[in-house]
C-alpha cells in the first residue's frame, strides 16, 4: 500500500470518492461481462488487466469533473503495477503483485470496503496519518515507522524500502 499511497501524497494523485466511483464504473463497463455474466464482479482479472486503459479517463486540457488528472492516472497505475524491490526478501521474492482490477467502487467501510476504505480514504494520505486516511495508509505507514524503521519520528513520505533492506528481510 505504501508506494501507491506515496503517489497520492500532497493531494495531487489522490482520488476523491466520486473519482473512485468513476474508476470503478469504468472498470466494470469494460470488464464485467467478460465472464458472460453482468453481475458487478470482474471475474477475469487478467483479461481485464490486459484490456483496461485508465488513460481513457484522463482529463483533456482544461477539463475538470468526470475525469482524472495526470497525477491521478499515475496513482491508479501505481496501485495496479507490480512493485519491484531493489533487493530480495528472505524467501528470494523481489516483487509484490499490483492490485487486481475490480472492486474499486465497492461501498462500505472496514474490511469489506473498496478503494475508499483501503486505498484512497476520505482524504489524501497525510503524515501523521489521520482517521480519514485509508486503512492501508494508516496500517502501512505505522508498520513502516514502528516495525521496519523502528523510528516513530521518521517522515514516512520519504520512506524507501532499500534503506531498510535488512529489516525488511527479517
Regions found by a protein language model. Name each.
Residues 1-170:
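C-terminal His-loop and adjacent cap/lid subdomain of alpha/beta-hydrolase
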Amino acid at each position: 500500500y505504501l508506494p501507491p499511497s506515496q503517489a497520492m501524497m500532497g493531494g495531487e494523485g489522490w482520488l476523491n470518492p466520486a473519482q473512485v466511483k468513476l474508476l470503478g464504473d469504468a472498470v466494470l463497463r469494460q470488464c464485467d461481462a467478460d465472464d458472460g455474466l453482468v453481475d458487478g464482479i470482474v471475474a477475469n482479472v487478467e483479461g481485464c488487466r490486459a484490456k483496461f486503459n485508465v488513460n481513457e479517463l484522463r482529463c483533456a486540457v482544461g477539463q475538470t469533473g468526470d475525469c482524472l488528472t495526470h497525477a491521478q492516472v499515475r496513482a491508479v497505475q501505481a496501485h495496479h503495477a507490480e512493485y519491484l524491490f531493489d533487493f530480495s526478501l528472505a524467501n528470494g521474492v523481489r516483487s509484490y503483485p499490483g492490485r487486481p482490477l475490480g472492486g474499486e467502487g465497492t461501498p462500505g467501510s472496514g474490511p469489506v470496503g473498496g478503494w475508499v476504505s483501503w486505498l484512497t480514504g476520505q482524504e489524501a494520505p497525510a503524515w501523521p496519518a489521520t482517521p480519514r486516511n485509508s486503512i492501508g495508509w494508516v496500517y502501512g505507514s505505522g508498520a513502516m515507522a514502528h516495525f521496519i524503521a523502528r523510528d516513530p519520528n521518521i517522515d514516512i513520505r520519504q520512506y524507501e524500502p532499500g534503506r531498510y533492506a535488512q529489516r525488511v528481510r527479517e
